[in-house]
Regions:
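Local cysteine-cluster metal-coordination motifs and their immediate loop/turn environment
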Residues: 46-51, 124-134, 177-196, 230-243
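Generic marker of "main functional regions" within proteins
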Residues: 63-67, 79-82, 137-140, 186-195, ...
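Homeobox/homeodomain signature
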Residues: 117-120, 187, 222
Length: 243
């Protein structure tokens, strides 16, 4: 229930193809390398992914003519950890996650019997603040979308703005202290697409993995924030992949 993005180049390999409610990855960034291949690459994009794809077109990082975009309907993407957080253990199968399924409840088969979980309670956090179900770019549309927004997109922003400078500094210091510098956020971010990344240089302390709470080691996040400011499409991939 944690499917990984993959390229399929033969008919035989397509037997391994999976696309269901657990396929939450934003595939637009993968089209940077796909644009360098001969011929067209078919890619499945959710509504929120198309914002990222359009941004990459503006930055000349992807070739629109090299992509055949299947706009896939979305009713929110699922997070297996959200299901486990409900206390369900020994999961063997999950029914209701197929994109053609419109059920409001997931049926979870376990070693200890059958359990049920509300679909909305198993969604990725970003889906609760979804900015819309309209595909901004596509060649073909399949499946139906369903509105999932049930929370204020700017509630956390308002909370931070209400803090004093000291409280705000403490808040961010606490959040960034959790970072293990695995680079997952950078690697998955569509806005982080430089051919050579500053964080791959050994000349900067910010290129090393964090081993203490020092401010300098948190420069990784400060630099990344400045680099993607004005280009971030709020796809939520950084939060999804962060361990």
């Amino acid at each position: 229930w944690n499917p990984e993005p993959a390229y399929f180049e033969t008919e035989e390999s397509l037997k391994e193809f999976v696309y269901d409610g657990f396929c939450g990855a934003n595939l637009s960034k993968y089209m940077i390398e796909a644009s360098k291949l001969d011929g067209k690459t078919l890619v499945c994009l959710k509504p929120c992914d198309t914002y990222s794809f359009n941004q990459l077109i503006k930055e000349h990082r992807v070739d629109r003519e090299k992509a055949y975009i299947i706009g896939v309907g979305c009713r929110g993407k699922l997070d297996i950890e959200k299901i486990r957080e409900t206390g369900i253990k020994g999961i063997t199968d999950i029914k209701g996650a197929q994109i053609e399924n419109e059920a409001d409840t997931l049926t979870v088969e376990t070693l200890y019997g059958e359990k049920t979980v509300e679909y909305k309670d198993a969604m990725l956090s970003r889906c609760h603040v979804c900015k819309g179900k309209e595909h901004k770019i596509y060649d073909e549309l399949i499946g139906e979308s369903r509105e999932t927004k049930d929370a204020d997109r700017f509630a956390e922003v308002e909370m931070i703005e209400a803090m004093s400078p000291e409280e705000r500094f403490a808040f961010f210091r606490k959040e960034l202290s959790k970072c293990i510098r695995c680079n997952a956020c950078r690697n998955v971010c569509p806005a982080c697409s430089c051919r050579k990344c500053v964080f791959d240089s050994t000349k900067f302390d910010s290129a090393q993995k964090a081993n203490s709470d020092s401010f300098e080691e948190k420069m990784f996040h400060i630099i990344r924030a400045f680099h993607v400011a004005g280009r971030c499409t709020d796809c939520g991939e950084c939060s999804r992949v962060c361990p």
